[in-house]
Structures are given as structure tokens and as C-alpha cells.
């Protein structure tokens, strides 16, 4: 179901060294030094996210690395991400609809839809490509819930903006591109569903 159609029908979303040599020529401990920190088998490194984002956003992705590093420095390395598109617009009260695919390393991929009201000044009826970083997701179906937070321009760099939403220790960080005049942060939520729906509540 096309995002713009849903929007219209709805009325117009983170080297430990091993040790010093012992005194008088005693051999060092047998335990080897730990390797440098890197992504675990189930999480994505910053470089993996940036590469996926460059392919997705294209020419406007020059500022993506800065936003990804900001997100990783605060929440660590995500164990999933969503690529999709959305539309929305608000002047005091508005709606947001989107659809895309949730990607994970070891739990498969899953189609997702999202919708939700926004309350505040986020004016412009924007249409946006959206990448969402997903943290602490225990299983793919756990994405289907409401995530509340500050759904607006928490960080804006160039043609991209980043926000954050959370529920039950799961954090979703949307990174959006698109058109529309954003006049400030608005408060709302995004509800992820298995199927497209007109109802954002």
C-alpha cells in the first residue's frame, strides 16, 4: 500500500592490554590480549551502517556518517536497521505513515509498516526516505509495538535529521531525508505493524 495513499486517506517516526612482564625475567602470563572492540556477530558496525545508508540515500548521504557516529556514541551498535519511506505533515496535529524492511544479521528480514500521530510543529507535508537504527531488539517480531519519544528534529545535519524513540529497552533511531519545513520538536509516537493500516492509534 503506497505511503502517500495511506497518508491522504488518513487525513492528512554502541585493546584491553594483557599485562606487564613479571620481575626478574619471569615469562609473561599465558592469557593473550583481548582483540580490539568490534561488532558482535549480531550487531552492525558503524561502517556497515554507513555503507548501507550511502546506497540507500545516494547523493544526500554525505552527512550520514556524522549522524551514525552520534547515534553509536550514545546507544552503541544496533542489531537491526530499517530502510523505507514515509510521508507526514503536522501543524499542531498531524499523521505519519511509512513502510520498509527490517534487516538483521542472524534473525532474518521482516516487512514492517509504521504509523502514528504527531503533536507539535513539524510543518510541510514531507515525503522522506527513512533509515531507522534498532537497538536491543530481542527478536524481529518485537518491533511490532508503539515507540514513544521526541519525534522531530533532535539533530539536523545537512539534508538529514535524526530522532529517537523507545519502549521496554528497545530504541529506534530514525534518520530521515526529505522535503518539508520543520519548525521544532514535536511529541508523538510511532506504531509498527505487520500490515498497513489507516489507523495511527
State where each predicted segment sits.
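Sec/Tat signal peptide C-region and signal peptidase I cleavage site
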Residues: 19-23
Amino acid at each position: 500500500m503506497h505511503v502517500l495513499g495511506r497518508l491522504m486517506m488518513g487525513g492528512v517516526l554502541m585493546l584491553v592490554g594483557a599485562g606487564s612482564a613479571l620481575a626478574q625475567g619471569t615469562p609473561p602470563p599465558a592469557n593473550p590480549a583481548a582483540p580490539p572492540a568490534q561488532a558482535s556477530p549480531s550487531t552492525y558496525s558503524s561502517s556497515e551502517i554507513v555503507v548501507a545508508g550511502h546506497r540507500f540515500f545516494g547523493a544526500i548521504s554525505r552527512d550520514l556518517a556524522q549522524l551514525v557516529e552520534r547515534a553509536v556514541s550514545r546507544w552503541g551498535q544496533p542489531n537491526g536497521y530499517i530502510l523505507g519511506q514515509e510521508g507526514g505533515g503536522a501543524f499542531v496535529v498531524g499523521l505519519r505513515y511509512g513502510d520498509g524492511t527490517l534487516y538483521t544479521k542472524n534473525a532474518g528480514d521482516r516487512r514492517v509498516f509504521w504509523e502514528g500521530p504527531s503533536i507539535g510543529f513539524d510543518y510541510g507535508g514531507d515525503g522522506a526516505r527513512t533509515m531507522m537504527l534498532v537497538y536491543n531488539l530481542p527478536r524481529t517480531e518485537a518491533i511490532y509495538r508503539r515507540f514513544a519519544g521526541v519525534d522531530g528534529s533532535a539533530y539536523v545535519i545537512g539534508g538529514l535529521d535524526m530522532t529517537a524513540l523507545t519502549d521496554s529497552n528497545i530504541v529506534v533511531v530514525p534518520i530521515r531525508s526529505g522535503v518539508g519545513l520543520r519548525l521544532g520538536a514535536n511529541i508523538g509516537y510511532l506504531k509498527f505493524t505487520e500490515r498497513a493500516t489507516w489507523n495511527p492509534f
